[in-house]
Amino acid sequence: MLLPKHHDTLVGIDSDGCVFDTMTVKQREHFFPAIIRHWGLEACADALRACAAFVNLTSKTRGSNRFPALLHVFELLPDYPGVRVSGATLPATDALRTYVHSGLPLGNPSLQAEVARTQNPELARVLEWSLALNDDIDARMRPVPP
């Protein structure tokens, strides 16, 4: 679809509500390292970064909620080159999958309630990751120039 030109400037809004592409910076500088750290995936870090970049930056799932995106990364990761031979222990995903498909609004408040209700350590780790990720972005995210 071609839009008719009405002005000399076009302002586009990114899928996370930003005028500038902060998503790439957030993913590469914050999300990817946090996943690696919280799940001890250093042995397959390159594959994790490639898989997470595909899911979060270049596929049709770009801009999706962090919890379904994390699940998708963990589901695809075993098939990435080098992962199986890396010796990395891949995360269990049953509880995350149940949460993602629960119909609950996906966010830290509902995840906190699910962790309290289920006492599931897998969900607790996801919550720890999500909260630490928010703290890291708040503390270290630099403004992205236009």
Regions found by a protein language model. Name each.
Residues 2-4:
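Short loop/turn motifs at secondary-structure junctions and domain boundaries
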Residues 6-7, 18-146:
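Alpha-helical substrate-recognition element adjacent to the catalytic core
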Residues 10-12:
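Hydrophobic "anchor" residues on beta-strands that sit immediately upstream
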Residues 14-16:
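Acidic active-site catalytic centers that drive phospho-/nucleotidyl reactions
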